[in-house]
A protein has these predicted regions:
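Short, charged low-complexity linear segments at domain edges
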Residues: 1, 15-37, 134-137, 229-247
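Iron-sulfur cluster-binding cysteine motifs and their immediate structural context
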Residues: 2-3, 9-11, 15-32, 36-38, ...
Length: 275
């Protein structure tokens, strides 16, 4: 059961957690802060479902050769709506259309503790929280099982995440026609532990909790000079130029804080699994 080097090769995608019939698999944080599965041997019945959906063990089955299919570039035409997003803003109109069709959206939000987590919702206010980049690996929780249940009930669902998370969603659900997979263009995900230590250090420095973060704010300059903005509980904003001054973003761009599987990712580039 998941008999390989988890710290080196696991993607922390949560597919195994979402298919275990006995709840014997849960995610824990490794020493580097990355999510890896831990199996409760007392509850495990050896059914092998975790191995069958493991995207690392079956990486060759989850690839969509983008180079052969071709692709299009697009961006949100509404200037104000685009400002609320980190890049071209295409997630939001796709999600809005899914809601108009009576469907659900699964995406990443900040929870009350300012941890990145995936949620499933058909409410516009939740979808608005999913906008903008979160430069940290999210906790997928039980979302994949929830998505599978909705798909089986005939509901259309849009799932948005990293390429490895999209592969996990496809593996758990069987990738039916009513599932729309939307992948980020990913260069690697900093571990949750790294973000949590940075967040807590800044909260201690400012003397109050962090309530919001924008890694690529288009205020005050715009697209060409994004700012890293932390907002504390009192509403005060603390900002630095993302690519020149902020140590968290700079460490990420230099590839210093990724989970280990990111350095030999089997799903990036043309090896994606999204629509």
């Amino acid at each position: 059961m998941l008999d390989f080097d988890l710290l080196k090769d696991c993607y922390g995608c949560g597919a195994c957690v979402n298919v275990c019939p006995r709840g014997a698999v849960h995610m824990t944080q490794a020493a580097d802060g990355s999510y890896i599965p831990e199996i409760d041997e007392a509850r495990c019945i050896g059914c092998g479902r975790c191995d069958r959906v493991c995207i690392h063990q079956h990486a060759d089955k989850n690839h969509t050769p983008l180079g052969k299919e071709g692709c299009y570039a697009a961006y949100q035409l509404d200037t104000q709506a685009r400002k609320a997003s980190a890049s071209g803003g295409m997630f939001f109109p796709l999600a809005q259309e899914m809601l108009r069709q009576g469907g659900y959206v699964c995406g990443c939000v900040w929870n009350e503790q300012m941890d990145a987590v995936h949620i499933v919702s058909n409410k516009l206010e939740d979808v608005e929280r999913m906008r903008s980049s979160k430069y940290v690996q999210s906790d997928i929780g039980n979302c994949l099982a929830t998505v599978r249940g909705l798909l089986k009930a005939g509901k259309p669902v849009m799932f948005c995440g990293t390429p490895c998370q999209c592969a996990a969603c496809a593996a758990v659900t069987g990738n039916p026609e009513n599932l729309l997979l939307v992948a980020l263009i990913c260069e690697g995900a900093p571990t949750a532990g790294v973000w949590q230590r940075y967040r807590d250090a800044k909260a201690a420095q400012y003397g109050e909790k962090i309530r919001n973060v924008n890694f690529r704010s288009k205020t005050p300059v715009g697209w060409t000079m994004p700012y890293f903005v932390l907002t504390t509980e009192s509403g005060k904003r603390h900002q630095e130029m993302s690519y020149r001054q902020n140590p968290y973003v700079l460490a990420m761009l230099q590839g210093l804080t990724y989970r280990q599987s990111c350095y030999h990712c089997e799903f990036k580039g043309d090896n994606g699994s999204a629509d």
